[in-house]
UniProtKB/Swiss-Prot annotation:
Function comment: After binding acetylcholine, the AChR responds by an extensive change in conformation that affects all subunits and leads to opening of an ion-conducting channel across the plasma membrane. Activity is required in glutamatergic neurons to mediate nicotine-induced and nicotine-motivated behaviors.
Family recorded in the similarity comment: Belongs to the ligand-gated ion channel (TC 1.A.9) family. Acetylcholine receptor (TC 1.A.9.1) subfamily.
Any one GO BP annotation for this protein: cellular response to nicotine
Disulfide bonds: 146-160, 208-209
Protein name, per record: Acetylcholine receptor subunit alpha-type acr-15
Cited InterPro entries: Neur_chan_lig-bd, Neur_chan_lig-bd_sf, Neur_channel, Neuro-gated_channel_TM_sf, Neuro_actylchol_rec, Neurotrans-gated_channel_TM, Neurotransmitter_ion_chnl_CS, Nicotinic_acetylcholine_rcpt
Length: 479
């Protein structure tokens, strides 16, 4: 019973102690090894360090904070002359694993890191080969600053880079070499496409130090996918702008005509607020999408102003406003209706009448009578009676003055005629005023309809032109 337990305990001790050859090899290598010493036999020569990046995933590119966050593996390779051995002397052991704090490692950091810990890589073991070559592949979540150009947002392309370099070793101590910029394990991002990448090494001398330092930069050229923004921002605004056009088809008598235009302006302001939350607070450039939204908002405000103007036309009358002058009448009641194939009730509107009206522009009345004129009826009879009474009354006055005859019957007759004349004159003037009021009101209402039709065409054309200009300015539309 005790024998199996004892054998299991001895086997466990053997596993914990590891291979005797590896233990002996580690002891031999670490004997006299100084971690702070550069691993080179000739101290005048630099240690050649190769650095590569295996990009796994683009986690986020924050436009608001101008930061790029990725998941990547770094691959460091260098040769440690103090860690070589002959495998046959150690039972053909060809490689060892060491913790990173046990061996010399280059103090290479990510210069443009914005992570709170600055160095966010995970400290994995180093692989030591018998030739002295060291492989070290620490994974990490790297967050770097990335200056964004938001002018073409959301049809934009951004260039971000990862700048690595030694913090203390100068160029004559560490020489950097380009490693692989690998995307074999890359997980595609839903918002960004990698269209180009490159690696370059630069030598720079800083003001703090007289020596030269090398750094290696891995650059990513990204292009934004536009489907999300086109579907959730651009398309709704275009549909909202259709309401601006449809607002001019509503009758000017409807009070909700102005309310519809104001609602459209408020809706566009909401989209502007959403866009401002997506872009950084910068005064260097205005995003293309912002230009489009502001233009649509301006068009909406302009449409609201014209709608108010149209309604003021519709409710005008002779008692409050003056009659149209010749140019307004010619443009709104003759030329524009002829151009738009519109016709005022009971009025001919063709090229001939347009020409005649233009030729008679110096006359005060250059338009034909409307449907409110009466050919025969009580009004005409009263008007004729007023003229007849006026003539008779003036003739009697003349006779009285000439003959100087003023008996009581004549005077009474004159008084009766005076009263009849005054009443008929009042009725005639009242009817003329009503007739004139109706004609003037009809002209203003027709002018309001004409302006509405002109705005319908003008704003439709304006929205189409603005949309085409914005689309042509974009570097690309679909990605």
């Amino acid at each position: 019973m005790l024998l199996p337990i004892l054998l299991h305990f001895l086997l466990l001790i053997t596993q914990l102690n590891g291979s005797p050859a590896e233990v002996r090899l580690i002891n031999d290598l670490m004997s006299g090894y100084v971690r702070e010493e550069r691993p080179t036999l000739d101290s005048s020569k630099p240690v050649v360090v190769s650095l590569g990046v295996f990009l796994q995933q683009i986690i986020n590119l924050s436009e608001k904070e101008e930061q790029l966050e990725v998941n990547a593996w770094l691959k460091f390779q260098w040769r440690d002359e103090n860690l070589r051995w002959e495998p046959t002397a150690y039972e053909n052991v060809t490689d060892l694993r060491h913790p990173p704090d046990a061996l010399w490692t280059p103090d290479i950091l990510l210069y443009n890191s914005v992570d709170s810990e600055f160095d966010s890589s995970y400290k994995v073991n180093l692989v030591n080969y018998h030739t002295g070559n060291i492989n070290w592949m620490p994974p990490g979540i790297f967050k770097v600053s990335c200056k964004l150009d938001i002018y073409w947002f959301p049809f934009d392309e951004q260039v971000c880079y990862f700048k690595f370099g030694s913090w203390t070793y100068t160029r004559d101590k560490i020489q950097l070499e380009k490693g692989d910029f690998d995307f074999s394990e890359f997980i595609p991002n839903g918002e960004w496409i990698i269209i180009d990448y490159r690696t370059n090494i630069t030598v720079k001398q800083y003001e703090c130090c007289p020596e030269q330092y090398e750094d290696i930069t891995f650059t990513l050229h990204l292009r934004r996918r536009t489907l999300y923004y086109s579907f959730n921002l651009i398309a709704p605004v275009l549909l909202t702008m259709i309401l601006v056009i449809l607002g001019f088809t509503v009758s000017p008598e409807t009070c909700e005509k102005v309310g519809l235009q104001i609602s459209v302006s408020l809706a566009i302001c909401i989209f502007l607020t959403i866009m401002s939350e997506l872009t950084p607070q910068t005064s260097e450039a205005v995003p293309l999408l912002g230009v489009f939204f502001h233009t649509c908002n301006f068009i909406s405000v302009l449409a609201t102003s014209f709608t108010v103007y149209v309604q003021s036309f519709h409710f005008r009358n002779q008692h409050v406003h003056e009659r149209m002058d010749f140019w307004m009448r010619f443009i709104l009641l003759e030329w524009s209706p002829w151009l738009l194939r519109m016709k005022m009730p009971d009025r001919e509107n063709n090229f001939q009448t347009l020409t005649e009206s233009w030729k008679g522009r110096n006359r005060r009345e250059s338009m034909a009578r409307t449907a409110f004129e009466y050919a025969d009826g009580p009004v005409t009879q009263i008007h004729s009676m007023g003229i007849m009474l006026k003539d008779n009354f003036e003739e009697l006055i003349y006779q009285v003055k000439q003959e100087k005859i003023a008996d009581e019957k004549g005077i009474e007759r004159l008084r009766v005629l005076q009263k009849i004349y005054d009443h008929v004159k009042m009725i005639r003037e009242h009817d003329d005023d009503n007739d004139e009021d109706s004609r003037v009101a009809l002209e203003w209402r027709f002018a309001a309809i004409v302006v509405d039709r002109l705005c319908l065409l003008a704003f439709s054309l304006l929205i189409v032109v603005v949309s085409i200009i914005i689309a042509l300015r974009a570097p690309y539309l679909f990605a």
